[in-house]
Design a protein with these regions (language model features):
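Sec-dependent N-terminal signal peptides
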Residues: 4-13
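Vicinal oxygen chelate
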Residues: 18-26, 28-39, 65-68, 80-165, 170-171, 193-196, ...
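Core segments of cupin and vicinal oxygen chelate
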Residues: 25, 31-74, 107, 123-126, ...
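Structured core of small recognition/catalytic domains
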Residues: 177-266
């Protein structure tokens, strides 16, 4: 019996030592987010015209559209199932070392491929988080980033894009503890802010990347079977702006007009000015000021705020 206990201790200690020996490389921010669309033309109107974002050549298999936000981008592929209620394909984070991160995740029990793949934008690999969301890690290639023509960078651009920074993305989360084990315990994400529609309730938890200011927002307490519109509101991206009045004025100059009285900016529960527009499949594109203008309602910020750089 003592031998069994001894060997169990040795094996457990060896596994723990292996985890400790493999260091996590830096995860610095959001590289891109990819969605599905049923209307390319309407999509192009929103991103290229209203938001003034540069269009770019597709990078991924099956991709139809790509819009550049500074050094980040949002992409769209054709919706494979028009009746599906989720238009988010995957979220990609930037890392300084794709191979090292893959080894690190494997050492912590995450199922990964045997090696990272190569693409036009650098090295990358994908995993599924505990709830099945597709998460990609990208080690961008500086050489490819520096070639605008023919390598996927901006093909055309307005001189006055509404935003040059993608500051967060969010999606529906059912089991916060399971997601925290993956994002917080293993990957090192940290809580930036949390709040809810009612005092004492957490409906949103902003999990900041460990080595930057971008964050992933858990959208909590959502109905078990949300429709396309609800899912579109929850599975979203957020573009950072310095001044919301200036951002809305730019959109109006680009031809945007409010549809109803609810089309206006407002201060969110986190104390930041926010404004929402939607793609043709109801996916929300949130504009958000980088810093709060008033104290948040539910909790203090626990991490640094993003900026345009």
């Amino acid at each position: 019996m003592k031998r069994i206990v001894c060997w169990t201790f040795i094996l457990t200690s060896a596994g723990f030592a292996q985890q400790m020996a493999v260091q996590r490389p830096k995860i610095t921010g959001i590289d891109h987010v990819d969605f599905y669309t049923s209307n390319e033309q309407a999509n192009n109107h929103l991103y290229a015209e209203v938001l003034g974002l540069p269009s770019a050549l597709p990078l991924e298999t099956g991709q139809l559209q790509r819009f550049v936000i500074g050094k980040q981008w949002v992409g769209y592929s054709a919706a494979p199932d028009a009746k599906a209620t989720n238009r988010m394909d995957h979220v990609a984070f930037s890392t300084e070392d794709c191979d090292a991160l893959r080894v690190y995740l494997a050492a912590h029990g995450v199922k990964v491929r045997e090696s990272a793949g190569r693409s036009k934008e650098g090295r990358s690999f994908r995993v599924n988080d505990p709830e099945g969301n597709v998460i990609e890690f990208v080690q961008p290639s500086g050489a490819i980033r520096a070639k605008p023509s023919g390598q996927g960078e901006a093909l055309r651009a307005r001189p006055d894009p509404v935003s040059r920074r993608l500051i967060h993305t969010g999606f529906i989360v059912r089991d916060r503890a399971a997601e925290d084990h993956f994002y917080k315990d293993i990957l090192g994400f940290r809580l930036y802010w949390h709040g809810g529609m009612k005092d004492g309730q957490t409906d949103w938890a902003a999990m900041q990347v460990p080595d930057g200011t971008d964050w992933l927002e858990y959208m909590l307490n959502i109905d078990a079977n949300p429709d396309l519109q609800t899912t579109g509101v929850m599975n979203h991206i957020s573009l950072g702006v310095r001044d919301m009045k200036e951002a809305v004025a730019k959109m109006e100059a680009h031809g945007w007009k409010p549809h109803d009285k609810d089309d206006h900016s407002e201060i969110g529960k986190d104390g930041k000015w926010q404004f929402d527009v939607f793609d043709p499949d109801f996916t929300r594109v949130e504009l958000m000021e980088f810093t709060p203008t008033q104290k948040p309602c539910c909790s203090d910020f626990q991490g640094p705020h993003p900026s345009e750089k």
